[in-house]
Amino acid sequence: MQTQISLASRSETVRTLGMRASAAPYRKEIEKQLDSGNTVVIDFSGKEATQSFVDELVGALVLKRGPSVVSKLSFKNCPDDVKSIIKFVINDRATQLSQRAIA
C-alpha cells in the first residue's frame, strides 16, 4: 500500500521548511507508515526545504534503517534544488553507515 504525506499540511504559511525540529513529526509519520509495510510518497507541493530539514526527514531514516529504506520512499512535486539536497543527504548518510561498518 502507498501513503502520501504532504509537507504542506502542517505548515501552510511557511514556504521554506528549515528547522530539524519541524521535520521530526513528518519523519515519525513516515516511520509509522513504513512499519505498517507501506511505501511513502513525500509531497513537497509549494515547499522548499533546507539541508537540515531533509537530513532530519530522510537522512535520519537512512541512518536508522539503512540505505534500502530509500526504495520505499518517493518524492513528489519536488523542486530541483531540493532533489539535489535529497540526493546529497542520502549519499552522505549511506557513506557514513559504510564507514561505520569498516571501523
Predicted regions and their residues:
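STAS-like cytosolic regulatory interaction modules
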Residues: 1-48, 59-103
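A structural signal for leucine-rich repeat
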Residues: 55-57
